[in-house]
Design a protein with these regions (language model features):
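HotDog/MaoC-like acyl-thioester-processing domains
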Residues: 1-6, 88-90, 99-137
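Hydrophobic core residues within well-ordered beta-strands of beta-rich domains
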Residues: 23, 32-34, 76-78, 94, ...
Length: 137
């Protein structure tokens, strides 16, 4: 990925603090897992009052890549697999968390889950990510 500008201009759709159309996600890192909480407004629905699966996939991907950044690696998703378990209703807050499954050189396998407040898991994901540079400190 040489030649790409990987600097953060705070316009990321998921976490960019300067993106007025973004989700404004903030993350917590406990040394092993990254987590965030989000609820989607109606403008992000697919079917009536159901969050579009693409948006949920985006947040699952974001939390997995953010885990690697917090662990010191800028990474890009090479493969993403999402399993939708239950419909997510517009406005329902979810916790999305990610953890490392495996690390081999520059390749990382990461998992994530999206869970309602009552503990119901609405989606889970796995990704293969490739480190592209050390994360800025």
């Amino acid at each position: 990925m040489s030649g790409l500008d990987l600097s953060d201009d705070s316009m990321c759709f998921c976490c960019g603090s300067r993106n007025p159309d973004g989700l404004g996600l903030e993350f917590e890192f406990d040394g092993r897992e990254v987590s965030t909480t989000v609820s989607f407004p109606k403008k992000f629905q697919g079917y009536r009052d159901i969050v579009h699966g693409g948006l949920l996939s985006t947040v699952l991907d974001e939390v997995m890549v953010t885990l690697l950044i917090k662990m010191g690696q800028l990474a890009a998703t090479a493969e993403l697999s999402v399993r939708f378990l239950k419909p997510l209703r517009v406005g329902d807050p979810i916790e999305v968390r990610a953890w490392l499954l495996e690390s081999r050189g520059r390749v990382f396998r990461v998992a994530a889950a999206a869970t309602l407040k009552d503990g119901t898991e609405v989606a889970r994901a796995e990704s293969t990510c490739v480190a592209v540079a050390p994360a800025p400190t």
